[in-house]
């Protein structure tokens, strides 16, 4: 059956021989403070523990924080019990810890691989919608602002990997990277736990929570502009027009969901189901692009998953004109089911392809021998540099990066 579900081309499989993953984390919070905590934690991880298990537990933390808000904030406007906000803050802290320890564990056990990178980023992509819902529920800004927050979250994520596809390196900003966002979210949750969520509802139509969302959005826009600028300045790349063409899937997806949210009441009637359906769809689209980047494969401009999305959007457009073909709620559930099935198929068969080719397993790794030679040592040799953890003084532009300062994240 696997021959019918091959998400990586033969060209992509062949290109894995040239794989290396390098990145620069300029995070102020990470380099100045949290780095020491991450290094401390990795001292306690046993050598038999696969990095992907750490990554999976981090995803479970995000699912846990989402379920808390799902139960207590069904319309994204309710006030949850104070303990919920402290619990969410703890789970975010646990997630950011695990999200950084998994890479260190991979280096520690000499088990770095393309599968590990893909697994890590796919879990992060799935978490975008959950973070949007959780933070919006905390700020009590309602479904439409939650939808806006989701779009604000997915674009910087997609563009970061778009830039990496062409630059060959993932660069995270000093004050506008994921670590700073997670720290900000933790602070918001702790403040809400202490003072209650009513502090975010001050104001009439423009509340404190909405103002906070706008400020976060400005940071996201700045990050996106940096991605465009850095990619435009790159030398030895394809023409910038062809680079922009690779954004077709995310542009089409954004246009479709904006139209859908504009013509349908589903976003207010089923806010959690609506946003999570979009989140799983984005996770799939983003994961396909990450796979193509990791394998240096050709980028697809259209995926079959867009067909059911277009059909459901057209169904809602007709319903807004009193032409009812299928109940919008039923159509939403069908799309949710299709999205889950497609994502699971992609995850299973892509993992199988990589494991078969690399001769590795997803959740187990060979115990390293005394010589330190592991089964994935060939990938370690392909890294640009292995340096001791230290503060980074690298700028946000890829032009400023010194190869000796590159490390695997």
UniProtKB/Swiss-Prot annotation:
Its GO biological process annotations read: phospholipid biosynthetic process
Q: Please list where the region (Disordered) is annotated.
A: 388-409
The family database entries (Pfam families) matched by this protein are listed as: CDP-OH_P_transf
Which organism is this entry from? Dictyostelium discoideum (Social amoeba)
Its Gene Ontology cellular component terms are: membrane
Entry's localization field: Membrane
Where is it mostly found? Answer: membrane
Report the gene name.
captB
Which residue stretches does the UniProt record annotate as biased composition, category Polar residues? 388-401
The protein in question is named Uncharacterized CDP-alcohol phosphatidyltransferase class-I family protein 2
Q: Coiled-coil ranges per the record?
A: none
Q: Does the keyword Membrane apply?
A: yes
Sequence similarity: Belongs to the CDP-alcohol phosphatidyltransferase class-I family.
Please list the GO terms describing molecular function: phosphotransferase activity, for other substituted phosphate groups
Q: Where are the transmembrane segments?
A: 53-73, 83-103, 115-135, 141-161, 183-203, 205-225, 243-263, 265-285, 299-319, 329-349
């Amino acid at each position: 059956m696997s021959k019918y579900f091959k998400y990586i081309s033969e060209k992509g499989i062949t290109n894995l021989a040239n794989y290396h993953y390098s990145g620069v984390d300029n995070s102020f919070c990470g380099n100045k403070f949290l780095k020491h905590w991450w290094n401390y934690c990795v001292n306690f991880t046993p050598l038999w523990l696969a990095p992907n298990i750490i990554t999976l537990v981090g995803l479970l933390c995000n699912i846990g924080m989402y379920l808390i808000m799902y139960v207590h904030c069904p319309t994204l406007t309710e006030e949850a019990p104070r303990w919920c906000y402290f619990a969410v803050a703890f789970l975010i802290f646990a997630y950011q810890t695990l999200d950084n320890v998994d890479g260190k564990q991979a280096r520690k056990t000499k088990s770095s691989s393309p599968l590990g990178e893909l697994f890590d980023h796919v879990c992060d992509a799935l978490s975008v919608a959950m973070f949007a819902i959780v933070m919006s529920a905390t700020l009590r800004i309602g479904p439409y602002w939650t939808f806006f927050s989701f779009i604000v979250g997915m674009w910087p994520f997609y563009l970061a990997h778009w830039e990496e596809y062409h630059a060959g390196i993932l660069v995270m900003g000093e004050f506008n990277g994921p670590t700073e966002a997670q720290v900000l979210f933790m602070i918001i949750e702790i403040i809400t736990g202490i003072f209650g969520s009513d502090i975010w509802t001050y104001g009439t139509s423009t509340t404190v929570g909405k103002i906070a969302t706008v400020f976060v959005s400005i940071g996201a826009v700045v990050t996106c502009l940096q991605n465009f600028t850095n990619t435009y300045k790159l030398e030895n790349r394809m023409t910038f027009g062809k680079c922009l063409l690779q954004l077709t899937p995310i542009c089409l997806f954004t246009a479709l969901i904006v139209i859908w949210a504009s013509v349908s009441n589903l976003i207010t009637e089923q806010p959690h189901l609506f946003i999570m359906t979009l989140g799983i769809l984005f996770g799939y689209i983003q994961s396909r692009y990450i796979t193509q980047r990791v394998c240096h494969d050709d980028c697809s401009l259209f995926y079959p998953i867009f067909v059911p999305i277009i059909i459901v959007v057209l169904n809602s457009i007709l319903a807004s004109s009193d032409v009812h073909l299928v109940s919008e709620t039923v159509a939403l559930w069908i799309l949710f089911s299709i999205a889950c099935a497609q994502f699971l198929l992609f995850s299973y068969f892509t993992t199988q392809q990589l494991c078969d080719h690399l001769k590795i397993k997803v959740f187990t790794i060979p115990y390293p021998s005394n010589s330190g030679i592991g089964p994935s040592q060939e990938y370690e040799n392909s890294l640009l540099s292995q340096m001791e953890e230290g503060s980074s003084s690298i700028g946000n532009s890829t032009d400023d990066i010194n190869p000796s300062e590159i490390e695997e994240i």
